A protein has these predicted regions:
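Preference for intrinsically disordered or flexible, low-complexity segments
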Residues: 1-194
Length: 194
């Protein structure tokens, strides 16, 4: 896959965070029926869930759930979209996956092309703010594509999942046309060094 260059911008303002929109590493939640239907491989890890209804002005469906998976050997991503509410859940799948390998998880914000607003997609502690929680949101980071790094004529992909681990970031990319068709089979993954 062609590598895309990014630039990172620190964002100090942490207002208007929607901390319930996503669960990222540490306490993933996955619907039992979905888990059984996917036949996940031993190397394919569930890393995040997004509740579309809890994200302000999402560029993807306004309801339903997005589940992010990544094969840690081939680095091939899989994103599954369903409108079914995960009433029955599995809390501890992929327990051996240790985020500490990548350093401290970092909360990230992202910006979509042509829009001024940013949306929060990652949270290092899904229980942050709840009684007994020891988690902190950390510094937010705005991740932007450097348009100059894209070949002429290539459509700029949208990012709809950015996850930070200390000195690097995992970024999920999707072409705008695929997103409009709700076709999540054409998702790309890149690893970006800070």
């Amino acid at each position: 896959m062609e590598r895309i260059t990014y630039r990172l911008i620190r964002v100090e303002n942490e207002e208007n965070q929607d901390l319930d929109a996503c669960k990222l590493l540490g306490a993933p939640v996955l619907a039992k029926g979905l888990f059984e239907a996917l036949h996940l491989k031993d190397t394919e890890y569930f890393i995040a869930q997004i509740n579309c209804a809890q994200v302000k002005n999402p560029p993807f469906p306004e309801k339903g759930w997005l589940y992010f998976f990544l094969d840690v050997e081939s680095l091939k991503p899989r994103v599954v979209y369903t409108e079914k509410d995960p009433a029955e859940v599995i809390d501890d799948i992929n327990e051996p996956f240790d985020a500490d390998v990548y350093g401290d998880p970092t909360c990230l914000k992202m910006e979509f092309p042509g829009e001024k607003g940013s949306f929060l997609f990652g949270e290092n502690d899904p229980d942050i703010g709840l009684e007994g929680s020891t988690g902190t949101a950390g510094k937010l980071t705005l991740l932007q594509i450097d348009a100059l790094a894209l070949p002429q004529g290539k459509q700029k992909p949208l990012r709809f999942g950015d996850f930070g681990f200390g000195d690097g970031h995992w970024v999920f990319l999707i072409e705008e046309k695929a997103l409009e068709k709700r076709d999540f089979r054409r998702v790309e993954f890149v690893e970006v060094e800070s």
